[in-house]
Amino acid sequence: MVYLASKIFGFLITPSNLIATVCLIGVMLSLTRWRKAGVRIGAAGILLLLVCGYSPLGNVLLLTLSERFPAWQESGRAPDGIIVLGGAINPDLTAVRGAPEMNSSAERMTAAAVLARRFPNAKIVLSGGNANPFHPLSTEAEVGRKFLEDLGVADDRIVMEGRSRTTYENAEFTRPLIHPVAGERWLLVTSAYHMPRAMGVFRAAGFNVEAYPVDWRTRGWVDAERPFLT
């Protein structure tokens, strides 16, 4: 119930959905005796849409997240393991269609495949369940394992954590599954804009990981002057 409520709340406060809600409230009020207030609220919603969509604001907000952790540079000994967070795969669509169906964060899985080949002795931990709260057909971890196996990654290298539905649960369920010890090196693979939250959650769980950001959405601070929708 808490998970479902958090998803509904998250949906409502997503900027695009929040702006749409403001506009809708404005339209509804304009049809009542509070017409003037409705017009003002609707106009404010349209103004927010223009500012967020056609100004650099969206890129600036994205950059404040994605630029906190730079691209990983290989140095020192090879990592002992690689943790790949879910969010790249649609497990239910995959179950129906019979082939891995990925979204705009697919780089999480392609990076996992590249790292698996670069570091052949590293464990690959796939942390991702199914965000469908009603009738989940599969998990991201299961689909991810099949994807990596098809690319030649040995099954005995892959560890599946298929219960997590949030970043907090990624850390909560992964740490006791692999029991990391002091001195081990673990890479954490997720989207660049998601990395600050992921690193914070894993560190809070007592799991010392190294950031391996992927799925970059900007070219860097040069995009701070570029309209968000261009």
Which residue ranges define each predicted feature?
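Hydrophobic alpha-helical transmembrane segments of polytopic
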Residues: V22, I41, G45-L48
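A structural signal for short, hydrophobic/glycine-enriched beta-strand patches
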Residues: I46, V51-L229
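Membrane-embedded alpha-helical segments of integral membrane proteins
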Residues: M1-S30
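Hydrophobic transmembrane signal anchors and adjacent membrane-proximal interface regions, especially
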Residues: L12-T14, K36-A37, A171, I178
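Short helix-loop boundary/capping segments at the starts of domains
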Residues: T14, L18, W34, L63, ...
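Residue-level signature of transmembrane alpha-helical entry/exit and packing/kink sites
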Residues: K7, V39-G42
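Membrane-interface helix-boundary motifs at transmembrane edges
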Residues: S30-G38
